[in-house]
Amino acid sequence: MNERFLIEIEGLNKTFDDGFVSVRDINLKIKKGEFITILGPSGCGKTTTLRLLAGFEDPTYGKIKVNGLDIKDLPIHKRPFATVFQDYALFSHLTVYKNIAYGLKAMYTKLDPIDKLVEQYHQSLLDKQHRLHKRIERLEKSNANPQLLEQLKQTVVVQQKQFKQQTETFKQKENARRDAIQQRLVQLTKEWESLSKQKLQQLEAEKKLLDKKFEQTERKYQKDAWMATHSEMRLKQFKQEVLALKQLIKTKFKQNEPVDKLQLKLQTLKQKYAAKRQIDKEYDKLVLAYNKKDYWTSYWETYSLQQQEAFEKRYLSRKLTKQEQHQKVCAVIELVGLKGNEDKLPEELSGGMKQRVALARSLVIEPDILLLDEPLSALDAKVRKNLQKELQKIHQQSGLTFILVTHDQEEALVLSNRIVVMNEGNILQVGSPADIYDSPKTEWIANFIGQANIFKGTYLGDLKIKLHSGEVIKTDVDNNYVVGKEYKILIRPEDFDIVPKNKGFFNVRVIDKTYKGLLWKITTKLVDDTIVDLESVNDIEVDKTFGVTFDPIDVHLMEV
């Protein structure tokens, strides 16, 4: 049975005008209700990925599917996302209550069920009767205008006889009206789907023609060896190479050394780049044309759905009443812990409170997916930890899909169902917090997530590894390692146990120590000068030698 995913990112790329590639053809699938954290250092592409999802940036190419439909070209307000920003972005002149309620002004809900409308109509007739009875009572007390009094009494009798019939007539009319709307919607949906199918077939044929032109243009690059190896060269890199050659020619000339070959190389570089630029222009035109086709493909793929939503919004929906808005605002204020602060302005709030308001404002509009752009990074440590717990609680209670962007490894490990590790625009690993921390795929990930001790060794078979320093250790993880192949071995500092000298797997000598409150960070050396960091609850003197042990489950092998 195929798994259902709420979000599917396919081959997503973002290349800026200066040629910088921020997001490199990434692929990611997210299930409904997950808490996903995109983790990485500054400049890794995580925030750009979030902005692409939200619609604040347009991708160079690739797809962003939600419930199977590509939404990358949908405007921001039509996407099923809400975003919580790092800088809060609150309205300074509005109270907490009004900031949260702001998005509800444009929110629609389905029309009330017919039975409820009939009940409301029934009540309006009762209210009308009640007002007539009150008027009759006043006239009877005053003994004024007996003729009018008699007319009103007759009116009450007539209305009572017609009461049931009026209610039934109203119900029949409302049923007939809604049936007609539904029939019209079914008819229009068929027309919209037929039109979109026709347009998509036409676009597919046009894309195939463009694909052939792409192949022809790419063959032009391959005809020349220089172009084949420099097809990605940008103007900035070309200028740098020209300047470097000119500087070298100038230096050689001053030293009375021959420069003919360098001048020829410079001239050839300019000619080759000029020829390449002509092909680049052809290629760029094709990319522009293809992107336009891709835009319209995305448009027509969602055309029928958008038309249905617009139709339902107009004929089968209504705006929220003030009472409904108030109920939603009060519920979300309770959820995020803002009760008692409804009438305060943002300037009267702490950073943590402001972030709660920003979170509440996003939650109140009931998005399918909540995007969190480093919302806790500007807060102090204690407030941040408290809000982390609040986020976990809100995620569990709301059942929404959360996508958090952060560079804080601890935050990612604490909050997430799954972590997406990014660097230089690439997704390096996707997994549970335990997988990412305990079984990183690369040395870079191991060092980025927490502290890591990396050893080099050779796999001997039978789950045994021989370290370069000569010691033989064991792992209990069998991942089809190749006998005789060199691997990098990860052991976390907290996984070491300190034992007396010569009683462990190997001995280490203390070269430094740092007190960290609950623990001491002890820096040691192996006999081959390999640095080993470990943790101890007790202070250990510098230059002391002792043994260390660890469990095989804590030994993780990585490709070199």
From Swiss-Prot:
SMART domains found in the cross-reference section: AAA (SM00382)
Similarity-based family: Belongs to the ABC transporter superfamily. Spermidine/putrescine importer (TC 3.A.1.11.1) family.
Main location: membrane
Binding positions for ATP per the UniProt entry: 40-47
Membrane-related topology note: Peripheral membrane protein
Catalyzed reactions: ATP + H2O + polyamine-[polyamine-binding protein]Side 1 = ADP + phosphate + polyamineSide 2 + [polyamine-binding protein]Side 1
Subcellular location: Cell membrane
Domain ABC transporter: 7-449
Subunit field text: The complex is composed of two ATP-binding proteins (PotA), two transmembrane proteins (PotB and PotC) and a solute-binding protein (PotD).
Insert: annotated segments: 108-318
Keywords, alphabetical: ATP-binding, Cell membrane, Membrane, Nucleotide-binding, Translocase, Transport
Function text: Part of the ABC transporter complex PotABCD involved in spermidine/putrescine import. Responsible for energy coupling to the transport system.
Molecular-function annotations in GO: ABC-type polyamine transporter activity; ATP binding; ATP hydrolysis activity
InterPro entries: AAA+_ATPase, ABC_SmlMolc_Importer, ABC_transporter-like_ATP-bd, ABC_transporter-like_CS, Mo/tungstate-bd_C_term_dom, P-loop_NTPase
Superkingdom: Bacteria
Enzyme Commission number(s) from the entry: 7.6.2.11
One GO cellular component term noted in the UniProt record for this chain: plasma membrane
Protein name as it appears in the record: Spermidine/putrescine import ATP-binding protein PotA
Pfam families hit by this protein: ABC_tran (PF00005)
